[in-house]
Structure formats: structure tokens, C-alpha cells
Regions:
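Divalent-metal-activated hydrolytic enzyme cores
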Residues: 213-215
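Conserved small/polar residues in nucleotide/adenosyl-binding loops
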Residues: 219-221
């Protein structure tokens, strides 16, 4: 069943890419494993998932330990990260999807033993309930990260508003792509910013149409 559900999602990715003449290889599927146990996450890995995401530090560390026999897994931390937990996690992950303040970046820089690929979280929709910097703050924030030499800004991340129309979701994701292009055009060495992390289970088709390169999906067990 897991393999069937995974194949269904991969087919949906291919179909969405075909609509806008994109190569499916440009899109990385990240499985959100926060709602499954380690044994089920292992089934996903055995079915071909190589990117796993958690939104809690303790759960990611637990699953990484349980899946020690699969060093090829790329681990993604999504969601808000408290500064006091930075030291516990930053050297255990491959990607961080929610960089949104200089204080957090400085703490990450302080604790890192190796380079970490980070996405800057941008609150494109302007919802007060969402984390992330405002679009107006983006360029100054990117420039301020130059001193954090172990942080590599690989791209931008955003989430669509809840209960939004397809038109609204297209606008949010399209705006993030425009912001990504703006940063990329600056040619910052510390911020190549070639990636877009946007789209979850309910809206990743729209995200792909708007240029997403990383999508987060719950894969039903």
C-alpha cells in the first residue's frame, strides 16, 4: 500500500510537470513523516523515499537514530526552530526550511560543524499566524547572512494560506518565485537561491506549476 501511494504521488508530480513542460527530475519529493512511527518511515525509505521531514527536533532525532542503517536519507527540518534547540539539531540535518531571523541564523552559525543548506521562510500571504519574514525584508536579510559563512541559502520557502482559492495559491507561489529570481540575480556567493520549497499534499500541483523544486507531502500509510 505504501508503494502504491508513493507511486500515485510520483505520477501526480509527473502529470503536474507535464502541464507546464517541466522535467520531473527538477522536483524533489520530501516525505513528511511526523505522523508515522519509525517502522512506517522505514517502509517509505525501502519504497524509494530518500528525503524525510519532521517539524519537531526530538522526533527527527528519534527517527534518524532508528533509521541509522539508511545513511543515504536526507533529513529536513521544517517548521519553527527555537534557538535553545539549535545545538541539538543543526549538525544532524541536511536541510532547514524555516530560517527567518538573524538571531536564529547567528545561533545556527555558532553551533554548526559543517555547511547547512537553508531555505529562508517568507510570509508571502501576510498572515499573522504564519512565521517568516516579509517580502520587503528579504534582500536586507539575505545580505545580513553573508557573515554566517556556514549557512548556505539554497532557496526560499513559503506556505499557502489555509482555505485559499486556487487563484490565491497561484499568486502566493508565483510571488515567491519572483522573490527567488530577485535574490538569485544578485549573485550572492552565500545565497545561490536556486530552489523553491513550497507546496504540500493539498496544493503541490499548483506549486509545481509555479516552479517549486521541493515539495512536502504526507504519504498515506
Amino acid at each position: 500500500m505504501i508503494a502504491d501511494n508513493l507511486q500515485k504521488i510520483k505520477q501526480e508530480i509527473q502529470d503536474s510537470c507535464a502541464l507546464v513542460h517541466r522535467d520531473p527530475k527538477e522536483v524533489t519529493l520530501v516525505a513528511v513523516t511526523k505522523s508515522v512511527e519509525s517502522a512506517q518511515a522505514e517502509e517509505l525509505v525501502r519504497a524509494g523515499v530518500m528525503n524525510c521531514a519532521e517539524n519537531r527536533v526530538d522526533k527527527l532525532l528519534e527517527k534518524k537514530q532508528d533509521l541509522f542503517d539508511f545513511p543515504e536519507i536526507k533529513w529536513h527540518l521544517i517548521g519553527n526552530l527555537q534557538r535553545r534547540k539549535v545545538k541539538l539539531i543543526v549538525n544532524e540535518i541536511d536541510y532547514f526550511h524555516a530560517l527567518d531571523s538573524l538571531r536564529l541564523a547567528e545561533e545556527i552559525q555558532k553551533r554548526l560543524e559543517k555547511e547547512l543548506s537553508c531555505f529562508i521562510e517568507v510570509n508571502v500571504s501576510g498572515e499573522e499566524s504564519k512565521h517568516g519574514i516579509s517580502p520587503d525584508e528579504l534582500l536586507p536579510f539575505v545580505e545580513s547572512l553573508a557573515a554566517c559563512t556556514k549557512i548556505k541559502v539554497v532557496g526560499l520557502m513559503t506556505m499557502a494560506p489555509k482555505e485559499a482559492s486556487d487563484e490565491q495559491i497561484h499568486k502566493v507561489f508565483g510571488t515567491l518565485k519572483e522573490l527567488r529570481d530577485l535574490v538569485q540575480a544578485k549573485g550572492y556567493a552565500h545565497a545561490p537561491c536556486s530552489e523553491l520549497s513550497m507546496g504540500m499534499s493539498q496544493d503541490f500541483q499548483i506549486a509545481i506549476e509555479e516552479g517549486a523544486t521541493f515539495i512536502l507531502s504526507l504519504i498515506h500509510i
